[in-house]
Amino acid sequence: MSGCTSNYLVCEGREIHYTEWGAGHAEVVVAWHGLARTGRDMDAMAAHLATRWRVICPDTLGRGLSQWSPEPGAEYCLAFYEKLAVSLLDQLGIAQCLWLGTSMGGAIGLKAAAGRLSGRIRRLVLNDIGPQLAEPAVQRIRSYAGSPPAFATMAELEAFFRTVYAPYGWLPDAQWRQLTETSMRRLPDGRVTPHYDPAMVRQFTDHPDDYLQWDAWDALALPVLCLRGEHSDLLLPETAEAMRARGPRAAVVEIAGCGHAPALNTPEQFALVERFFAA
């Protein structure tokens, strides 16, 4: 984890872990990961952006090194994640920021930019997420995220990740290994499993309309860039077209060779995000 620091803060009564890159810079990028992932997914992008920005990469409640919620029905939802984001920024003294969010992390940014962080998020990058999700893709994600498997070896866990996250696009072997090592935990019986609270998928049953955010979208008054995986089953082409036509009228760029969601790990993806944030 060269180039960043590992930190913890209590936000809304819950301990939240985050990594910080480029600590000497005044301008801040918040980079927030996807549903069943961790902030370490942002390492490659954060290392690139840290040459000119301070980058904060949280682990969402119930993921990675952050605390698991004792009230999963109430707290695994966008409204509580938005509260966590506000608390995190307030405690870090961040008055304004640029926001990069993959999947769920983008949905949090969308909600916050139209809500509690209106005026504080200056620019928003949504990585394969919009104000509406395709239901078959949600069911696909729930099928593996809601009942995480356990394996005897790290090699088996890595093979599992390579299968379910194949839509991320190109990752070198070293990055697959890092993805595995930074998103695993060992069970009491010694087996390894993905590093998150399986109860976080209750969001889809306890808050079934959480990801339907057209009202928030139409209220946005900031520049938005949407990266859509060419083969994404979550962000459909018609949704992306509607995002171009209404609300903040997003710029939409299709990322070739990816589904849900681009891994944010290639020079092309670095350049797209950097140019947008620097504009």
What are these regions (language model features)?
Residues C258-P267:
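Catalytic histidine-centered segment of alpha/beta-hydrolase-like enzymes
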Residues A152-H207:
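Conserved alpha/beta-hydrolase catalytic His-Asp/Glu region
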Residues R185-A242, E254:
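Conserved serine/cysteine hydrolase catalytic core
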Residues A95-E135:
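Conserved hydrolase catalytic core segment
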Residues A44, C57-L100, L272:
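Active-site loop/oxyanion-hole signature of alpha/beta-hydrolase fold enzymes
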Residues I129-E156:
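A catalytic-pocket lid/entrance helix-loop region that shapes and gates access to the active site
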Residues H17-W68:
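Conserved HGGG/HGGXW glycine-rich cap/lid loop of the alpha/beta-hydrolase fold
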Residues M1-V30, T51-W53, I94-A95, R122, ...:
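Alpha/beta-hydrolase fold catalytic core
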